[in-house]
Amino acid sequence: MPVKPIVRPIPGAVTRPGRKPRWLSLAAGLAAVAAGVACLAAGSASAAPARAARPGTAGGAGAAVFRALSCGPPDYFIQCYSPGQYQVAYGVAPLLRRGITGKGEVVVMPELANRPGPDFTDIRTDLAAFDRKFGLPAAKLKVTTTLAGASAPYVAGTEEVEDTEIVHAIAPGASLDVVLVPANATTSAANFTAAVAGTIRAAISQHAAVVSISGSHGEHFFAPAQVARLHVALRQAAEHHVTVVASSGDTGVISDSGPPKQVSLPASDPLVLGAGGTALNASTVTGAYLGEMTWNTDTEASAGGYSTLFPRPAYQNGVGRVGRMRGVPDVAADADASTAMALTFAGGILYPAQGTSAATPLWAAVVALADQDAGHRLGFVNPAIYAIARGPAYHRAFHDVTTGDNSVFWPTRLFTGYTAGPGWDPATGWGSPNAQVLVPLLAHQTRPGGIVHS
């Protein structure tokens, strides 16, 4: 598919220190905190000037919300929204007021069995601090050690904190199950595949509603047998009415290991709801939604494009910019550190969420809300998502992201990506949720007792 070239200056954008190839994308995020990059939470003093807007923004999606602190490069600010502002921006607040909180639903998240060290903390302590800081109910957290071994140590890095706190902020009544996977899950495609398949088995055995996977690798990383094993596991999830949401990745049109252009698994599998990234602009006072654009820092961006492994699924038939092959992502949400939700780490330090691994648990939480509203687990939601998006309620149920692109530099060469536009696009999918409309529609669109086939 022809792509309009994007003209961009030489990259000079600052990204969070220590970003790693995708499985648990924020594992080195404490380096940023230790460097003094932090954000203040609700009730902070006067707002600081926003970072310069990227070309094409209207007022900048990174409008200041709280006064930002930085010991990093001059004039670089990290700005954060509170969970309450996120709830308003994405239409969750009205659902919470009527008791749709995710109560009774279980969201499963695979996380590495981290070894204790200076870059890790206790997730229970962090969740408790998060709840106190932002007035949330106590989180219901379980840690499953089956895959990593009963004696596996568990301490949280910033990725684990991000996954759990975002789900808890959006679906505060849902139960959180952290499934520990072996620390070597990042080292090979075989180990990654085993970790994902094992997590899905654990979710099925616990009758979980949703699996939220923040890890990804480019399709070229996997052998055919591993792709097949992943697909079998995902089919089992669908058969047991478990929704799987996965991050599309943080490297635009290339994979985490660099060129060539490719999309990433598991998000590219048609049985997965793939989540891309945006930069959110919301009211600094009320949290009211003002707009979004494609997340892009020039060296990191919302990953998206077209699969080389999976043909176009039936639910994407007739979608204008999808050709013969599966298009990714399906949906998107905030992934930009300069427009992020504040997270609590190390018992009280606040830092910004970042990456499509922030969008993924948000969408997992939205599905959990819809599960509760429906009174049953929705399972494979992609056909319902596409049916709603292609119907008359699209612009009420979704925020259509129509500006920006996912071109990236690697390391100094520009890889031209895809522009966002009206409707579905390979930068932000259908866009981000307006949950107060989308959740009831999802609850109505799906049916209990069987798969809505692709």
Question: What is each stretch, according to the model?
Answer:
Residues 291-309:
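Extended ligand-binding clefts on enzyme/binding-domain cores
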Residues 366:
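Walker A/P-loop NTP-binding active-site region of P-loop NTPases
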Residues 48-274, 303-355, 360, 371, ...:
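Substrate-binding/charge-relay-adjacent region of secreted/lumenal peptidase catalytic domains
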Residues 281-287:
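Short acidic, Gly/Pro-enriched loop/turn segments at secondary-structure junctions
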Residues 2-48:
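Secretory targeting and sorting signals
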Residues 278:
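A short beta-strand-to-loop transition that corresponds to the Sensor-1 phosphate-sensing loop
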Residues 10, 20, 318-319, 371-426:
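An often Trp-containing, charged/polar helix-loop segment at the C-terminal end
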Residues 451-454:
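Ser/Thr/Gly/Pro-rich low-complexity, disordered linker/stalk segments of secreted
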